[in-house]
Amino acid sequence: MSDALPMSPAEFEQALRAKGAYYHIHHPYHVAMYQGRATREQIQGWVANRFYYQVNIPMKDAAILANCPDREVRREWIQRLLDHDGAPGEDGGIEAWLRLGQAVGLDPDQLRSQELVLPGVRFAVDAYVNFARRASWQEAASSSLTELFAPQIHQSRLDSWPQHYPWIDPAGYEYFRTRLGQARRDVEHGLAITLQHYTTRAGQERMLEILQFKLDILWSMLDAMSMAYELNRPPYHSVTQERMWHKGITL
C-alpha cells in the first residue's frame, strides 16, 4: 500500500478522524461512567490513575520542544506546558485535577504519592513519554491528535456526571470545562503540523499507526482499571490484598 498515491489533505484528515471509532470514550469503563453505572471506587480509581497521565503530559510536551528546531512551533507548543503546569502565579491543569480528586473524595497527598497508580497504567503512560523522547518532533506532536476526539469526552462528563453522581463536588469539574477550549485550540495546531509533514503514502500510513499507538495507550490504561476496579483483580490479587506493586523507579 505504501506505493500507492498519497491521500489528499482532506482524505488524510478523514482517515485520522475515522480513528475516533477506537477512542477510549467507547471503552466499557468509560461507558459505565457516563451512563451512571460506575461505583464511587471506580470513579476514584479512574481519577487517581489518570493523574499519572496528567503529570506526565508536560514531560511529553517538553520532549517535543527539546527535539524541535522550529522556533515558531516551539512558541505555540509551549502553551501546552503552561496549560498543565500553570504559568507563574497561576494554577494549571495539574492543580485542577487535584481539585477533581478532592471532589471525588481523594486526598491530594495520596494522589501526588502515586501509590494508587496501577502498573498497567504506569507502563502505558511511560511508553508514551518514551516515544515522545525518541521519535521525531513531528511524529511525537502528531501522536497528540487523539485530541481530535477529546472535546466529546469532556462534554460527556460535564453532561452526565452531575446528574448521576450528586456526591461529587461540582467544583471538581473545572478541569473538563477548561480543556474543552484548550483541546480545540491544540487540535488546530497539531492537525496543521500533521497535514503538512506527512505528504507521502508511506508517511501517512505510519502516522495512522502512530495514532493507533496512542489510542492503544489510552485503551490499555482503562483495561488495567477494569481488571482492578470492575473485576476486582488488581495485581497480585490471588496472593495478597495489599498494593504490592512498585510506585515508580527513578533512573
From Swiss-Prot:
The keyword Oxidoreductase applies. Pathway: Cofactor biosynthesis; pyrroloquinoline quinone biosynthesis. It catalyses: 6-(2-amino-2-carboxyethyl)-7,8-dioxo-1,2,3,4,7,8-hexahydroquinoline-2,4-dicarboxylate + 3 O2 = pyrroloquinoline quinone + 2 H2O2 + 2 H2O + H(+). One of its GO terms (biological process) is pyrroloquinoline quinone biosynthetic process. Keywords: Oxidoreductase, PQQ biosynthesis. Ring cyclization and eight-electron oxidation of 3a-(2-amino-2-carboxyethyl)-4,5-dioxo-4,5,6,7,8,9-hexahydroquinoline-7,9-dicarboxylic-acid to PQQ. PANTHER family: 4-AMINOBENZOATE SYNTHASE, PQQC-LIKE PROTEIN. Belongs to the PqqC family. This is Pyrroloquinoline-quinone synthase. The lineage of its organism: Bacteria, Pseudomonadati, Pseudomonadota, Gammaproteobacteria, Pseudomonadales.
